[in-house]
A protein has these predicted regions:
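Amphipathic, Lys/Arg-enriched alpha-helical "gate/interface" segment within cytosolic domains
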Residues: 2-147
Length: 147
């Protein structure tokens, strides 16, 4: 019996008690199901807490144009957002997302602590945030060279 393998291009965890959503993305576009699930989770946290933060790590993958449009339509607030990526091209492109949210800042992996500063993660929560991000990263599908 063959098992179906489902790609995981975007994974996330909501830390409601810390008013934080941590997400990790590989270098591929998220599926619409992944994106819509993430968007619903963020919207739900926003409704519950009013103020929240986003920590995103990515290997260069990003939402499609249609997904960005859904984000823009649903964006009720402009949460402080830190995007961490080793891709210089991605960080340049992502900085243009400030038209959606002026509180977005991009950081290289070596600037991870600055990313946590940007979204006001307390010293006591930093280790937990790092562990969650590392665990999420392990859940991602590694895209093949043909993707």
């Amino acid at each position: 019996m063959a098992t179906e393998s489902k790609s995981r291009n975007l994974v996330y965890q909501v830390l409601a008690d810390r008013r934080l959503v941590i997400s990790c993305q590989n270098r591929s576009f998220p599926s619409d199901a992944e994106w819509d699930s993430w968007l619903a989770a963020v919207s739900n946290l926003e409704q519950k807490t009013k103020e929240f933060r986003l920590l995103v790590t990515t290997d260069g993958g990003h939402p499609t144009k249609a997904q960005l449009e859904r984000l823009r339509a649903k964006n009720g607030s402009n949460p402080p957002t830190a995007i961490v990526s080793s891709s210089l091209a991605f960080r340049f492109m992502a900085s243009a997302m400030t038209f959606i949210n002026p509180k977005i800042r991009c950081f290289s992996p070596s600037e991870f602590e600055k990313a946590l500063d940007h979204i006001s993660i307390t010293q006591s929560d930093r280790e937990h945030a790092k562990e969650v991000a590392e665990n999420l990263r392990r859940q991602l599908t590694v895209p093949s060279s043909t993707d």
